[in-house]
Amino acid sequence: MIVLGIDPGYALMGWGVVESEGSRMKLINYGCIETKAGVPMQNRLRTLQLGVKDLLNIYRPDDVAFEELFFARNVTTALMVGAARGAAIIAAAEYTENLYEYTPMQIKQAITGYGKADKKQIQQMVKLLLKMDEIPKPDDAADAIACAITHCQAGVAKTQFLMK
């Protein structure tokens, strides 16, 4: 199974492609789709949407896993990231119905065994689980890889994480 993990973002949208076979996982590729500040919102969203479409066409994932948004304070940031997430979901929905979402706590629990793990712990475990030489950068890409790993580990229970 090939999974595209996405960490929604407006300036940087992290992505990671992980292939799993049984309990074995292999990192295929990762990176970020970047939008430039000062560009009109609709153009930035279009860049994100087209970027996700390109990833889907290149890697042909079986499933797409999104990290759910969690913002406690900044409403403006939440709205912008929500719009970016929407652009990515629309692109993915045109490709497949197999869209899943995981909360940050579920990802932390799956990756480290502790639902309140910090970023460094998650990054270190991503490196370990995928036998990488170094921690993936930037953080957005590492988060997307962690989301893909979480989905791979969900196994038959993954249906409970289908987007509704």
Task: For the regions a language model picked out, list residue spans one by one.
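Phosphate- and other anionic-substrate recognition elements at nucleic-acid/protein interfaces
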Residues: 1-164
